[in-house]
């Protein structure tokens, strides 16, 4: 399983996401996540929600750079 598929599966398992896109390689990952759990939550807290299940991969240096974009379902529809 590729790192992008691993991340996608992990995030889907840990967070109730409506949409999840993960692209990139072992060093640079781009994540777009959509969920109603992001309603009324600031950007920092949204990123913390995504980072939490990824911490083991960051600590062991499997992941180096991560770009995260998060949206509530309404924000995604308006995008």
Curated annotation (Swiss-Prot):
What the entry lists under Pfam families is as follows: BolA
Q: What is this protein called?
A: Uncharacterized protein bbp_348
The family line of this record is: Belongs to the BolA/IbaG family.
What domain of life does the native source organism fall in?
Bacteria
Organism whose genome encodes this protein = Buchnera aphidicola subsp. Baizongia pistaciae (strain Bp)
| InterPro entries referenced in this protein's UniProt entry, alphabetically | BolA (IPR002634), BolA-like_sf (IPR036065), BolA/IbaG_stress_morph_reg (IPR050961)
């Amino acid at each position: 399983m590729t790192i992008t598929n691993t991340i996608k599966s992990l995030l889907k398992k840990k967070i109730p996401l409506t949409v999840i896109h993960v692209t990139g390689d072992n060093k640079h990952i781009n994540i777009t996540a959509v969920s109603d759990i992001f309603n009324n939550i600031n950007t920092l807290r949204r990123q913390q929600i995504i980072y939490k299940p990824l911490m083991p991969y960051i600590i062991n240096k499997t992941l180096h750079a991560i770009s995260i974009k998060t949206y509530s379902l309404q924000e995604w529809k308006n995008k």
